[in-house]
Amino acid sequence: MVQRKSNLHYNIYGKGIPVILVHGFGEDGSIWDNQVNFLKDYCKVIIPDLQGTRSSPLMEDKNTLTIEHMANDVKDLLDQENITQCILLGHSMGGYITLAFAEKYPNYLKGFGLIHSTAYADNEAKKVNRARGIEIIAEYGGYSFLKNTIPNLFGEVFKEGFSDAVDELIEKSKLFSNTSLQAYYHAMMVRPDRAFILKESQLPILIIAGTEDVAAPIDDLHEQAKLSATKYFHVLDGVGHMGMWEATKQVNEFILNFIENI
């Protein structure tokens, strides 16, 4: 493992085609540990911590951070490593960043993917919920907020059978400042719809969905998968928003198949 830091702290594992895995809201790069341990024998895996996460400082104000800022951070990472083409995969908020990157820097990509993520912008009800979340974080703290929301990300079978893993993710959430969490929520709330990227891109696109995912509903992802002619679309039965943990073997195989077929 090689540790590097630009604006972002990131780790590099293995050799070969560069594959960047971007974590989501309330997570850090360790969310991908199960994927790293598998994929590092097949490719160069790069795991950044987004700004405001762990050792990566928050560079923007909580009211000015955007998804595009975080996509630019990924571009800076690639430039620092002299990487001119990669595969970019994002989980949840990381998928929003991946789409913003695909819009702005398509020539850097051999392919990209959304793992439990959506190209749609927040609807009005979701924006209201985001705004309320920002208020709750300010009033009660980020840890309290995530302690209540994280369990809802998992499918029922995993949540009941692997409560220790759910507790582990909750415990890691203590690392986040209130400001960082509010900044992420604001960035997600104001992001534009990027469904057109799926329709217009000629790049291979990976989409992984869970039938019990309440954050990235399966019906939305079915609709979005139909937009792309170059898609790899996989559905995880009985899985919520966290397939990297809930269905590790399947997710690893889906990602490797995507890499090997590009």
Language-model segments: residues:
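Active-site loop/oxyanion-hole signature of alpha/beta-hydrolase fold enzymes
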Residues: 6-8, 13, 36-37, 43-89, ...
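Short beta-strand element of the alpha/beta-hydrolase
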Residues: 17-24
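Gly/Ala-rich beta-loop-alpha elbow adjacent to hydrolase catalytic centers
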Residues: 90-94, 98
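Flexible "cap/lid" loop of the alpha/beta hydrolase fold
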Residues: 99-104, 108-147, 153
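Conserved alpha/beta-hydrolase catalytic His-Asp/Glu region
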Residues: 122-128, 140-200
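Post-His helix in hydrolase/transferase enzymes
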Residues: 245-259
